[in-house]
């Protein structure tokens, strides 16, 4: 038995998920979510929205996020009463602030200094997972299908798994076939940004506000014409693409805020449903994870758009939808520490297998 910690803050930027994972059983021992401090969240919002930040302030933010990730580890270990020396390594995703693979020089950047995390926790850290995949010709995302493949390793039927974070991504798993996956488009990011702008709430709980509006079909049809939705897979995208500025250039003065929220939920539902329907007629089970798995109105829309396919939360398998990505980075850290390459060729389009991540070691004294 080996213990690893995974740290994840996704494109929703709703906090740091920390998960203690037992391997090789893939059992979640404990998980917590630590909210970002107001200053860090404000600086992250400014950075994502393209507001001016100096190079010095970005460097400081990298260290501050590292400190907050380390504090999440400290809180996790205190709650579960585990000593840092019992942990083999931490897998830290960091906080994505930019990700673009569309040009001749693709790039990705996750903040959260690995040296800071390892020094403050006394635990070896593996971070910067996505860069190696980009260098190997991949999209750098999504990685979730790798771990979904582990969970459904004994699958006897074709299933789809959709992780609905800020960006939604899909995994297709079938017996005796290579696992495939890619980014679909906006998951929660536009809905979260719109309700925050209009109501000051971080997210639309259960999709209640969206359910009070009416879908603006001309707007929905216009949004669905975005070129990203028509790219072939593998493909990936960042939250900075599907931003409020992307949305607002399509809005008209007579649109009500609630109707716009309903339309944004419909956009997420339609792009997910279209992806599932276009892929395979054999898919009969769709499992949801990520924050969107709690959005009742979104699940109802998906069920309506996907007749004959059972839509359920991955929680029905006894797996936490909230900590699945953090668990994945704990698992990825174990692969790196043990020099086990992973195969992302059918997911990100990478050329060949690779060992992901950079290691920030701590010399343990016993």
From Swiss-Prot:
Q: Is Nucleotide-binding there in the keyword field?
A: yes
Q: Which residues bind ATP?
A: 10-17
S-S pairs: none
Q: If you read the UniProt record, what top EC class would you report for this enzyme, in one word?
A: transferase
A molecular function (GO) term: kinase activity
Biological process terms in GO annotation: 1,6-anhydro-N-acetyl-beta-muramic acid catabolic process; amino sugar metabolic process; peptidoglycan turnover
Q: Where is the signal peptide?
A: none
Checking CDD domains in the record gives: ASKHA_NBD_ANMK
Q: Which UniProt keywords apply?
A: ATP-binding, Carbohydrate metabolism, Kinase, Nucleotide-binding, Transferase
**Known EC number:** 2.7.1.170
- Top-rank lineage group of the source organism: Bacteria
Which reaction is the catalytic activity of this chain? 1,6-anhydro-N-acetyl-beta-muramate + ATP + H2O = N-acetyl-D-muramate 6-phosphate + ADP + H(+)
Checking InterPro entries in the record gives: Anhydro_N_Ac-Mur_kinase, ATPase_NBD
What does this chain do? Catalyzes the specific phosphorylation of 1,6-anhydro-N-acetylmuramic acid (anhMurNAc) with the simultaneous cleavage of the 1,6-anhydro ring, generating MurNAc-6-P. Is required for the utilization of anhMurNAc either imported from the medium or derived from its own cell wall murein, and thus plays a role in cell wall recycling.
The UniProt family comment states: Belongs to the anhydro-N-acetylmuramic acid kinase family.
Record-given protein name:
Anhydro-N-acetylmuramic acid kinase
Q: Which organism is it from?
A: Legionella pneumophila (strain Corby)
């Amino acid at each position: 038995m080996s213990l690893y910690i995974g740290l994840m803050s996704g494109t929703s930027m709703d906090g740091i998920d920390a998960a203690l994972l037992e391997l090789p059983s893939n059992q979640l021992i404990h998980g917590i979510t630590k909210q970002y401090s107001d200053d860090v969240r404000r600086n992250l919002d400014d950075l994502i929205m393209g507001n001016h930040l100096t190079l010095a302030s970005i460097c400081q933010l990298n260290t501050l996020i590292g400190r907050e990730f380390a504090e999440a580890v400290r809180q996790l270990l205190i709650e579960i009463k585990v000593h840092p020396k019992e942990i083999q390594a931490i897998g830290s995703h960091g906080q994505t602030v930019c990700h673009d693979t569309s040009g001749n020089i693709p790039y990705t950047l996750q903040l959260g200094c690995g040296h800071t995390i390892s020094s403050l926790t006394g635990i070896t850290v593996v971070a910067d997972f996505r860069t190696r995949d980009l260098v190997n010709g991949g999209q750098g995302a999504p990685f979730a299908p790798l771990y979904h493949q582990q969970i459904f390793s004994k699958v006897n039927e074709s299933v789809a798994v959709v992780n609905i974070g800020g960006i939604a991504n899909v995994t297709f798993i079938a017996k005796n076939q290579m696992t495939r996956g890619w980014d679909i488009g906006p998951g929660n990011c536009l809905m979260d940004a719109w309700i925050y702008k209009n109501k000051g709430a971080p997210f639309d709980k259960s999709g209640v506000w969206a359910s009070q509006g009416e879908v603006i079909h001309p707007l929905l049809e216009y949004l669905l014409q975005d070129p990203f939705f028509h790219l072939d897979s593998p493909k990936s995208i960042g939250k900075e693409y599907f931003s409020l500025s992307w949305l607002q250039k399509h809005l008209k003065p007579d649109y009500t805020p609630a109707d716009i929220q309903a339309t944004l939920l419909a956009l997420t539902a339609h792009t997910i449903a279209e992806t599932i329907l276009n892929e395979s007629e054999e898919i009969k089970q769709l499992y949801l994870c990520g924050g969107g798995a709690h959005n009742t109105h979104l699940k109802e829309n998906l069920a309506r758009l996907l007749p004959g396919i059972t839509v359920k939360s991955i929680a029905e398998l006894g797996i936490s939808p909230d900590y699945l990505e953090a668990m994945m980075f704990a698992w990825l850290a174990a692969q790196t520490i043990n020099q086990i390459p992973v195969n992302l060729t059918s997911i990100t389009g990478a050329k060949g297998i690779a060992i992901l991540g950079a290691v920030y070691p701590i010399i343990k004294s016993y």
